[in-house]
């Protein structure tokens, strides 16, 4: 019993001490209301008016108007509505204002000129200018090829493929090759002739004697005399006498 009564007594002492602390705090607040407000406990003194919130100065003038704008949760421009009709009308007006453009092909001087996205009004003006050209050419100057302007506003026209001039170029390249082949023997003969002349000059300069045997003086050969054989030209032939 004594053990069970002890905790109860301790709890009672704590309750009385807490109640005394609260009573002392309330008395202090009543006596010093301004000091309690400065503590930041949210307790106002007697006769004290509530303080107004400090006014803030906006440095951005357009910020207030932007905050006032309300968000439109159901915009009319979304989906198929009036905005689509306005967009279609503006696109149609833009197409009407923009001139029609097609492909233009011009044949002049043996050349084919193709222009893409050429305005129709400019094509008509160009055709009128070509039709006003003088058909009579000057006598001294060569007559240029007539210009042919075709307007492709109705249907596109296929551009003719250029004709290849490869066989003509090969024939022109073979002509000088053949001419050089015919000139090669003559050139070789001329170079061989020059080489022989230079060689002859070098031989004449190196050898002290005359090269050609026709220019040399003939040497006279003396008849050989060999008396010891008795068959030479100086030998005396004695006639043989026959006995009667």
UniProtKB/Swiss-Prot annotation:
Keywords assigned by UniProt, alphabetized: Jasmonic acid signaling pathway, Nucleus, Transcription, Transcription regulation, Ubl conjugation
Sequence motif Jas, location on chain: 185-210
Domain Tify positions: 97-132
Description of what induces expression: By jasmonate, wounding, and cold, drought and salt stresses. Down-regulated by abscisic acid (ABA).
Name under which the protein is recorded: Protein TIFY 10b
Motif annotated as Nuclear localization signal, chain positions: 187-194
Domain-level remarks: The jas domain (185-210) is required for interaction with COI1.
